[in-house]
Amino acid sequence: MIELPELYFKTDIEWREWLHNNHNAAKGVYLIFYKVAHENDSMRWEEAVKIALCFGWIDSTVKSLGNGKRRQYFCPRKPKSVWSALNKTYIKELKKQNLMHQSGLNTIKIAKENGSWSALDDVENGIIPEALQKAFDYNKNAYDNYLNFAPSYRKSYLYYLNQAKRESTRQKRIAEIIELCDANIKSRDTR
């Protein structure tokens, strides 16, 4: 297993400089962040993500280290990695500010070509896939409960279904979503 560096930057400028010099060679890093009220200054998560996007990188898992300190994994974005609406909004901002590096622009080009750029558009817009809607049509209670959930809960179900790669997995997830919604369970995490 590759040992990844653990890096701490006070500012996004330092992070940008590191990525400028290392974005092609590094496999990933753990960035250290401190809470706003902590005695140690650190760049904010949002700043780190924006800089990462400039170079075709993305954030991933986070781990609390206690005492207002946390570690978050950042790495080059995989070609088939889907793009959230938030990250696409950041990209628009970064392009307007002329902050995008060519490696980040190349990542976007690949994503647009392979469909991962728009893969979450229906999820972000709350569009229920036809197969799930048919299942809801057979269970009015599940559908009514689903419609009463906050948009974030509905979106999490749509995302869960969207990420299924095989048809058999999609069918299992549809059945699970219907069962949970029928029981008025807003999230798979609260079972």
PLM ranges: what are they?
Residues 1-191:
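Charge-dense, helix-prone N-terminal extensions
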